[in-house]
Structure formats: C-alpha cells, structure tokens
Amino acid sequence: MDYDPNTNPFDLHFSGKLPKREVSASASKVVEKKWLVKDEKRNMLQDEINRVNSENKKLTEMLARVCEKYYALNNLMEELQSRKSPESVNFQNKQLTGKRKQELDEFVSSPIGLSLGPIENITNDKATVSTAYFAAEKSDTSLTVKDGYQWRKYGQKITRDNPSPRAYFRCSFSPSCLVKKKVQRSAEDPSFLVATYEGTHNHTGPHASVSRTVKLDLVQGGLEPVEEKKERGTIQEVLVQQMASSLTKDPKFTAALATAISGRLIEHSRT
C-alpha cells in the first residue's frame, strides 16, 4: 500500500487536490440587473419631466394669447362706449363707407340747424349714449361738469389710452333714474372735459346749466333744435372756436363740418 505524505488521513472525501475558488457569476448578474432598472427609472423620470415642461410651455403660450385677446376686446369695448368722443372721431370716420359716407357729405353741404342748450350733445339714439364737451382749466382735477343735474360719484380709474383718470357718476335720483355718466379729460385737447351719458333722465334737471354745448346727431344727419337760452356772449364764442380747432385736426372729415358749425354759431350768438 502506497502512502502519500500529503494526504489527510482524517478526510475520507479528499481527492488529493485542492479545488480552485471561483466567483459566482450570478451575483454579478444581479448587480448589473439592478443598475439597469435604475437607469430605466431615471430615463422614465427624465421623459416625464420633459413632457411636463413641454406642456407647461404650451399652457403659457395659450395663456398669453388669451390675455392678448382679452385686452383687445376690453380696448374695443371702451372705444365703442366712448365712440363719440374726439379721440374716436377718426375711428368712426374710417367706418363710414358707401351710402353712409354719401349721407355725411350731403349733411356737411346742407343748411345746419342751431342748438344751444344745457346738455345737448353728440347723440346716438340707437345706443341711448350721448357725449358732451365742457371747457375746463387744465389745472382742474375735480372732473366735475355743470350739466344741470345732480350726480353721485361712485368710482374712478386710469384708462390705457388717456393719462387723465376717468370718473364715474350716477344720477342723484337713483335708483328711480338709472342714468350714468363718465367724465374724462380729452386726450387730444386737454382743455375739454368729455362727459359720456348712458340712458335718458326721467325727470327735469334741478338747475339750469351755465355752460353751452352743441348737439350734433350723426345718425339723423343734422343738429337737433332745442329751446334757445337768453344767456349768450363771449363764453359761447370761445367754446365754439375751441371745438372747431379740435375737430379740424382731421382734414378728411371734420374741416368742412367744423367751419360750418363755427360760423353759424358765432353768427347766431351775435344776433
């Protein structure tokens, strides 16, 4: 019997050679799989962030368009509400085409009636909106006009197209009388206050107006006659001249009209 000195006599299963130590491949596969899962989750999160950013950008652009449309509609509404003011004469003139333009030309060339009264103003009967112009000192910031009626002020704000604030009034007979008015200094001619009236008074004014304005009905194509007042003089002439100067800034529309009104008012006031 051969004896091997390297043999452990107590190890019954010893084959005579030590096994090599090997690293398990399954452990490395598990680690690699975990990294792949993490990379996949990171990519998914990145895609989600990109999607949210893209959606946020679209919503921001949509909100900007909505705001632009809102401001455009708001400006249009204010322009329509004050379309009889000096600032909007040019806008209305551009809208006059065809038959309406012909009627306006016939009105300018026809004899013009005269009107001197407390709040007889440029009137649109269809919209029940009238506008009056009152001469005022540039230093006067009260935005109050003497039109023969009593009013209660309920608000004031700054508009986009005029540095002067706009004041809001209700008739003192409210709620039985629902007439409202807005008063703002003219942006083109600061020597005038522009009063826009909404509605018709269902009562007479408590006081007669000291100032005189001109009533011009652009819908009917003429000046509406009213009761002539006894008080006439230099105040009326100055007011007429100032109105003519303001209107004649648009030579295409108002030159002939302003000249005719100015001449006839001055001629009548001197008689």
UniProtKB/Swiss-Prot annotation:
Record feature DNA-binding region, as residue ranges: 140-206
InterPro entries: WRKY_dom, WRKY_dom_sf, WRKY_plant
Subcellular location: Nucleus
This protein's GO CC annotations: nucleus
Name the record gives this protein: Probable WRKY transcription factor 60
Annotated function: Transcription factor. Interacts specifically with the W box (5'-(T)TGAC[CT]-3'), a frequently occurring elicitor-responsive cis-acting element.
Matching Pfam families: WRKY (PF03106)
Source organism, top-level taxon: Eukaryota
Predominant subcellular localization, coarse grouping: nucleus
GO term, biological process aspect, one: regulation of defense response
A single MF term (Gene Ontology): sequence-specific DNA binding
Keywords noted in UniProt: DNA-binding, Nucleus, Transcription, Transcription regulation
Biological source species: Arabidopsis thaliana (Mouse-ear cress)
